[in-house]
A protein has these predicted regions:
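Active-site loop-to-helix "anion-binding N-cap" substructures in soluble metabolic enzymes
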Residues: 1-239
Length: 239
């Protein structure tokens, strides 16, 4: 077979426009199409959804692993199911928080997300004790509360660091939670999934990346999949 390395497809306006003409042009270079990029499956672009109309299309091994591992969270997870949502952007996390308010046993939010939370506080929503927009880490009381919940969980999803982990003085919360999840995962008491660029970077910095059950390669794609149960790129392969 032949290999052809293409330039960044987004330099062509037809990629993001999901142009049928551009999708056909891409399809003309191959006999089959394999999508192995979970991290871009939330985009309805020519190389992700458009091309599947013109070639026999399949999910690659990495994409299949992402789907099967994330479905362990969304479809009949072993309970209690606990979800930890961190980071600073509430808007991008809101759909997945609201989804898990309906389906998870516990949903824990970082101090910054807690400070900005103005929606319904359901019984399973656990806000940080230090709800402050200036807060750069969860405090000791919150760490203990979160760890007690994790201790009695059987499945944990974590998306978003719990503090400004880049600075050593603000990594304590993220470190404590990462170590607790890693410890329980390694002793087979917990199935753990972690995802998102900052979360993965923080856990890698702590040297714990290989201590979790599954590390997702998706950030926005993972959040959308968890909220909706599918993605445009995955749906396109199923048609």
């Amino acid at each position: 077979g032949n290999y052809e390395l293409l330039e960044n497809l987004r330099f062509n306006s037809g990629e993001e426009e999901n142009s049928e003409e551009f999708a056909k042009e891409l399809a003309s270079k191959a006999q089959i199409y394999v999508n192995d990029s979970f991290a871009t499956c939330h985009r309805s672009h020519a190389s992700i959804t458009g091309i599947t109309k013109f070639l026999p299309s399949f999910a690659g091994i990495s994409l299949q692993k992402e789907i099967s591992n994330l479905k362990k969270i969304t479809e009949n997870p072993e309970r209690p199911l606990s979800v930890i949502i961190g980071g600073s952007k509430l808007e991008s996390k809101l759909p997945v928080i609201e989804k898990f308010q309906k389906t998870a046993d516990y949903v824990m939010l970082s101090s910054l997300l807690s400070a900005n939370w103005s929606k319904e506080i359901t019984q399973n929503l656990i806000l940080s004790d230090n709800k402050d927009i200036e807060s750069k880490d969860i405090n000791e009381k919150t760490r203990q509360k979160f760890m007690e919940i994790i201790e009695k969980s059987r499945t944990v999803l974590w998306a978003g660091p719990l503090g400004m982990y880049e600075e050593e003085k603000y990594i304590a919360g993220t470190k404590a939670i990462a170590e607790k999840i890693a410890e329980l995962t390694q002793s087979n008491k917990l199935y753990s999934v972690v995802g998102g660029g900052d979360t993965v970077a923080a856990i890698n910095k702590l040297g714990l990346l290989n201590k979790f059950s599954f590390v997702s390669g998706g950030g926005s794609a993972m959040l959308e999949f968890l909220a909706k149960g599918t993605l445009p790129g995955i749906e396109a392969l199923e048609k």
